[in-house]
Swiss-Prot record:
UniProt cross-references to PANTHER family, sorted A to Z: EXODEOXYRIBONUCLEASE 7 SMALL SUBUNIT
Name of the featured protein: Exodeoxyribonuclease 7 small subunit
Enzyme class: hydrolase
Subcellular location: Cytoplasm
Quaternary structure, from the entry: Heterooligomer composed of large and small subunits.
EC identifiers of the protein: 3.1.11.6
Family stated for the protein in its record: Belongs to the XseB family.
Main localization (coarse): cytoplasm
The organism's place on the tree of life at top rank: Bacteria
InterPro entries according to UniProt: Exonuc_VII_S, Exonuc_VII_ssu_sf
GO biological processes: DNA catabolic process
The keyword Nuclease is assigned to this record: yes
Length: 77
């Protein structure tokens, strides 16, 4: 399982490895369940990262549109 400081990209690669091993190997049930659990935890972390990024993008977009409108209003006067 990746550490908390790993990047989004490294977590995606780790998730891909887990999925690949589960698709291509005959794993004992215990190992398959461990891989599944690790994959679900990674998905949750990745989802949280994406949601946080989406929130930042929305905030920046809204602020940018407001600033753009203000700048446009000052040119019209």
């Amino acid at each position: 399982m990746p550490s908390k400081k790993e990047s989004y990209e490294s977590m995606i690669k780790e998730l891909e490895k887990i999925v690949s091993s589960m698709e291509n190997e005959e794993l004992p049930l215990e190992e398959a369940m461990k891989n599944y659990e690790d994959g679900v935890k990674l998905c949750d972390k990745l989802y949280k990262i994406l949601n946080k990024a989406e929130g930042k993008i929305k905030l920046l977009t809204e602020n940018g549109e407001e600033e753009f409108k203000k700048a446009g209003d000052s040119y019209e006067q």
